[in-house]
Amino acid sequence: MYIHELNPIAFSLFKLKIYWYSLSYLFGFIFSYFYVKFILNKDFVNISFKIFEDFLGWAVIGVVIGGRIGYVIFYNLNFYLDNPIEILKIWQGGMSFHGGLIGVILSIFFFSKLKKIDFLNLLNLVSSCAPIGLFLGRLANFVNKELIGRPTNSDWGVLFFENDVLRHPSQIYEAIFEGLIIFIVILYIIKKKYYTSINVSSLFLIMYGFFRFTIEFYREPDSHLGFIFMNISMGQLLCLPMVLLGLMFVKKKNVGY
């Protein structure tokens, strides 16, 4: 058993509270920056590092705006329609991965058109470092005591709140499978140059969708939504088109190979 006593505030700077949740995004982009520099030396995609640097700002906008709008629309629309100012309070949590994914894909689409580069190449590059952000983001969710798991009697159960039951650390499950494992698999494909026959972005969609769908069975559904039907949550529903889309294009190789 683990008693959760972590503080969501990392530190304060001149009365400004810096949250672990915000830092997870910051370090996600920083680590991705250096990781992309590494994998581009493996001839992974026909894109220069300068192009990726130019895209970073677009990626930040896509993730933040898409993630927030996705959460508002998919998970708590009525609340935010009644309290629109709350939409701006991103530091309190409330981001949707699926919304962030759509936001980033749109950013990639418009950026690739502007720079006249191949959309799929940039999508594969971004997909290769997405697990880094997922890993850090899920750890931040754990610190924030959000997206908590369902009750469990296991030895690794977590007591998130006083007078509550032990719960699955579903955020840690997601950090391991959606973050660490997908990262290792994609890195292996890049190092072995299997990307000439396997589309990395499609593989990411399939693996993430499968892991997220499975782990949702150990995670409490959003209290204001509950299950959409039977024991299926909104997150699981949103994973289905991801997997189907990934299966459609998994054999489409990178341009130039």
Describe the role of every protein-language-model region:
Residues 1-257:
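A feature for loop-to-transmembrane-helix boundaries and adjacent hydrophobic helices
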